[in-house]
């Protein structure tokens, strides 16, 4: 694409289409132009015209048939992500789809195949660019924590919920609603080249719908860290959002602040395995004991003026998408990667037939 400004159409003007995407694109006027929106509610269409100076349509079909768009953002309700994205790709239209991309890996396969039209499918997994997550990856890759044994991802709180995203028919529930963010991060650390062994427990605690609002997932694999991922709506005392256990130290924190602590093996006392009972200098039974020199560091997120961490993630994703569409930069988030995410979630549903009769 040679055009320097990408013409965007947005499907949906709700919490995602307006509050996340449209407001994010307004910050990047040198790269993107909101040309049109589509929403079934008249008041939302009127508001979009006033706020963004764009055209507005009642249906996405009208929008794409009447506008020359370079990109369509699919921020429709979750259960419509797959069918609308599939139709757009078949029409040769580039798509940026909100999470969840689909419900099953088979649906993702159809979306990947539909790119034969020449259109590109991108996925809005903006948490991949969470500053705290990027810092975590930097710390892990530095090696100071040693071999990573376990990583915990926790998205917990206490809430009762009774809206459309509590229904299975709408692709609701904590797994498909909140899950795409931490599961994507977890799989980035686990590795996208191997399907993990999945263990999952689900419950319906405080939801008024038929989908789950408690999810516990354990991911394992040879030579990979164990992933402990929890999404709960019944946690009055939530744990840290991130916890890492390593052979030389560990990390804890959240999207705002991280703290990590480690020792340096080359400074540690030299030890050898002793197979006989341990005794102290007086000959009394003893436990293993040593003095390690610990190093501790921390990081705090400092967002650019006028932006919060969430807006930074959105801004980063759109800038990278722009580079892919106009400069030929390789995409960092691919539907092939998200297929693994859908496969993990499908296995989670399969293991919980008391909630999901079909995976």
Language-model segments: what does each one mean?
Residues 1-52, 354, 358:
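N-terminal Rossmann-like dinucleotide-binding module
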Residues 1-5, 71-73, 302-359:
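C-terminal helix-rich "cap/oligomerization" subdomain common to oxidoreductases
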Residues 52-112:
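Beta-loop-alpha module in the N-terminal Rossmann-like domain of NAD(P)-dependent dehydrogenases
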Residues 110-126, 147-152:
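Rossmann-fold dehydrogenase core element
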Residues 127-208:
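Predominantly a Rossmann-like dinucleotide-binding segment in NAD(P)-dependent oxidoreductases
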Residues 177, 184-269, 307, 315-329, ...:
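Contiguous beta-strand/loop segments that form the cofactor/metal-binding neighborhood of enzyme cores
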Residues 264-305:
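Charged, glycine/proline-rich intrinsically disordered loops and linkers
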